[in-house]
Amino acid sequence: MNAHDTAPVPPPGCPAHGSGARVPLYGPEFAADPQAYYEYLRHYGAAAPVELAPGVEATLVTDYAAALQLLQDSGSFRKDARRWRAFNEGKVGPDSPVAPLLAYRPNCMFADGADHIRLRQAVTDSMARVDTRRLSRSTEQISGYLISQFGGRGSADLLGDYAKQLPLFVFNELFGCPADIGDRVLFGISGMFDGVNAEKATSVLFQAVGELVALKRAKPGEDVTSWLMRHEARLSDEEMVHQLALLLGAGAEPLRNLIGNTLHRLLTHERYAREGGLIDEALDDTLWENPPMSNYAPHYPAADTELAGQQLQAGDLVLVSFAAANTGPALKASRQAGSNRAHLAWSAGPHACPSKEPARHITVSAIEHLFNELPDVELAVPEDSLTWRPGPFNRALATLPARFTPVRSGQRTVPQQGTGSTGQDSRPAPERPAERGGMWSQFLNWLTR
């Protein structure tokens, strides 16, 4: 008798019913109840066969210990996506909906060995220079601006109007984007992840980041872009563009969903309100149970190997389910007895998130400021009417409608910048008529009113 003979029934709506096929991690059924899918996948053992999109096969690690083994074994499991056998054999094309997040790019996420160490150290050292006071000031300024745009209405979509925009604005400030370049960075990243004309959005983003690199070569400032440029790793312009695109894109999407998922938890679980709105605790619980990047960390075996009893061939695509690993039955007792931050939401090993402390700080500050400004904010629709965006990687709500007592809209007193990193010291970048006067420009104008 093999594992399939005793397998439980797949979740309702799962196309794997009776077919023996790989379990699909896309579509509304998976988005509506991913934990039911993870429970089913655990029957296979520590790893299971899944499909990320039609025709895109992968092995998904669902066990905490096996996930740690993979993430920490950089000798046996590599990150360079040029090893991806199915892609090299033409079974997965560059037009696949999952290709943008899996295909190789010359950045530290897809690098191994000495290249990874050099690129990663440059990123880590540059991000470590971000002062928490500056981060708090920037988050508060941007939070105040965003709330001023919808506060008078008495209702808002806390995702589209707030959580989705705030990380991009904060990153624009930290990376020293002047008005025109910042507008196009916002346009590019939003389009890439929202799937609206993603090809154009990607082109706009990389062109804007390329101009930012040229700008900072000519006139560096006190910002992450300039620090990365001056690092002893001596990154080339091409390397600079790809590291910045990674930090901006891969940082903004999970962070906006972390803010959104934590807000969702605070607004739908009464115990946080009873206990004084413990934002830090709600954040940790979200990272354990509803992490914004639920299934990711693509790896490729360097040679035919075995992982927790599963046979893998060289070049197979292997992902880690942070959501499944964090919520495994064996972890329940140890989670209560041990650290509340031993989850895998930030990944682990040499490719763990280099920006987890800034991400925590931005999330807590953004939610604290929102609750201070809108103390009676509450969910505007029944919780069971909320929908989650389909897709194999992210755990993200489509919308988060809220209502509150309207607050007076107007110019708020904001702290002075003190760094000049938003572009006041920069030469003007070439304008793009389609994005002229965009969101970043409007925020900078609001700051100086």
Predicted regions and their residues:
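Cytochrome P450
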Residues: 1-449
